[in-house]
C-alpha cells in the first residue's frame, strides 16, 4: 500500500466518534453470512455485541445501521421490543428477559475501537 492508504490495523472496528453518543453503529462481519457487530456508545465508553437477538436469533435492527437506543442506556430489538442494557447486554424487558446479547471483547485506543478477540 502507498503512504496515502496506510495498512489497516488488525481488528479495527470503527472510530469512537463514528458512533452517535448514546447510540449504536453496525459493523459488518468479515465472513459472509456471519452476524455483524453492534457497537453502542455512552460518552467515552463503548460496548460491542453480536447483532443477534437471543429471542429468535435475528438481527436487532430492521434496516442496516438503524438501531433504537434510549437514554444512552438501552438498546431495543426492532422486532419484538426486547430492551438490552448497554454495559452488559442483559435483557431487562421483553420476550427474552434474563437472556443477554453475546459480548464482543473490544479495546479503545486513541478513540479507535478494536476487536480484542
Predicted regions and their residues:
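Short cysteine clusters
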Residues: 53, 77-80
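Glycine-rich phosphate/adenylate-binding loop and adjacent beta-alpha elements
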Residues: 95
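A short acidic, glycine-rich active-site loop
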Residues: 74
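N-terminal pre-ligand scaffold of iron-sulfur
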Residues: 1-71, 85-86, 99-117
Amino acid at each position: 500500500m502507498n503512504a496515502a492508504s496506510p495498512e489497516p490495523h488488525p481488528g479495527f472496528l470503527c472510530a469512537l466518534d463514528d458512533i452517535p453518543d448514546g447510540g449504536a453503529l453496525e459493523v459488518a462481519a468479515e465472513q459472509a453470512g456471519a452476524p455483524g457487530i453492534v457497537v453502542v456508545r455512552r460518552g467515552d465508553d463503548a460496548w460491542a455485541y453480536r447483532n443477534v437477538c437471543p429471542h429468535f436469533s435475528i438481527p436487532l435492527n430492521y434496516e442496516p445501521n438503524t438501531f433504537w437506543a434510549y437514554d444512552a442506556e438501552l438498546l431495543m430489538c426492532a422486532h419484538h421490543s426486547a430492551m438490552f442494557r448497554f454495559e452488559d447486554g442483559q435483557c431487562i424487558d421483553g420476550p427474552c428477559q434474563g437472556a443477554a446479547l453475546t459480548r464482543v471483547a473490544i479495546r479503545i485506543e486513541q478513540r479507535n475501537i478494536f476487536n480484542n478477540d
